[in-house]
């Protein structure tokens, strides 16, 4: 198992769009975005730990592809709450295959 994070980033300059991605370090990931924006408007508004975060991201992207800015993009024109629920659904699906004592709890950050 590779523990990492699924996250949602927003930027007030693009209020209807969210970015969904993965990382093993939320702070350094946010800093890479901030260097491209002189106003530092990117915010991680939601994240959760997931033992199989890269595979979960692939499934999320598949379910959200019709909201994407471009085919291989990570920016989606989708309501923040809907995007958040897509991340949580992936953790629920992962947990459904585990015995009760091994289930992963949602541990998240919200802005």
Q: Where does each model-flagged region fall?
A:
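Non-catalytic accessory segments flanking enzymatic or RNA/DNA-binding domains
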Residues: 1-111
């Amino acid at each position: 198992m590779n523990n990492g994070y699924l996250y949602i980033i927003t930027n007030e300059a693009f209020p209807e769009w969210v970015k969904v991605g993965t990382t093993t370090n939320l702070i350094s990931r946010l800093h890479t975005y901030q260097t491209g924006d002189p106003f530092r408007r990117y915010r991680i508004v939601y994240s959760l730990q997931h033992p199989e975060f890269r595979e979960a991201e692939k499934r999320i992207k598949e379910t959200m592809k019709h909201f994407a800015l471009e085919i291989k993009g990570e920016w989606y024109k989708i309501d923040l709450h809907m995007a958040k629920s897509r991340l949580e659904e992936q953790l629920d699906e992962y947990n459904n295959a585990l015995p009760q004592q091994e289930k992963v709890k949602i541990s998240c950050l919200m802005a």
